[in-house]
């Protein structure tokens, strides 16, 4: 999903130098980040037009989460007609990924986060995720922050909890994820 015109041209030259060469490509347009690293989704979504005869195998099973998140996320992504249509399902029909939404007054933002953390069993892992690296700004007024290398943590209710952007969290897992600034503001989700 991150293929650019430059990368395409490089692969094209390699293939022209060795005509029997085959490509084995893996990607997921649902995970693409618009124009990340110069990517051009046309190269991915119209792969056969650029690379020739193609066999496509869709991976439609997720091992990361269950319903209702499978349905909600798939429905959201497939609203974009340019996305490759897929029928995503969880590897286990018994696996559930519960979603909870909390309304809060801006003045109670940090207290609301503290209450959420306090309600999570201590043996469960937690991530604080923001869209932007500054989404943790208000937390720094109430909670101790710790920087270890390039990782940031907040001590909330005696627990050290990592803060990441959604982009940096790609591929990571936690038992509980708290999305910060999940609103309709200028910098919200």
Predicted regions and their residues:
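Short beta-strand/turn micro-motifs composed of small residues
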Residues: 27, 130, 181
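Conserved Walker B
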Residues: 1-3, 29-30, 169, 182
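Helicase P-loop NTPase motor core
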Residues: 53-55, 61-155, 169
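Conserved RecA-like helicase ATPase core segment
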Residues: 5-96
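Generic beta-sheet signal
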Residues: 23, 124-130, 161, 177
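Conserved helicase C-terminal RecA-like lobe
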Residues: 122-125, 169-189
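Short catalytic/ligand-binding loop motif for oxyanion handling, primarily in non-cytosolic enzymes
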Residues: 32-35, 65-68, 135-138, 172-173, ...
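Conserved two-lobed SF2 helicase motor
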Residues: 159-168, 176
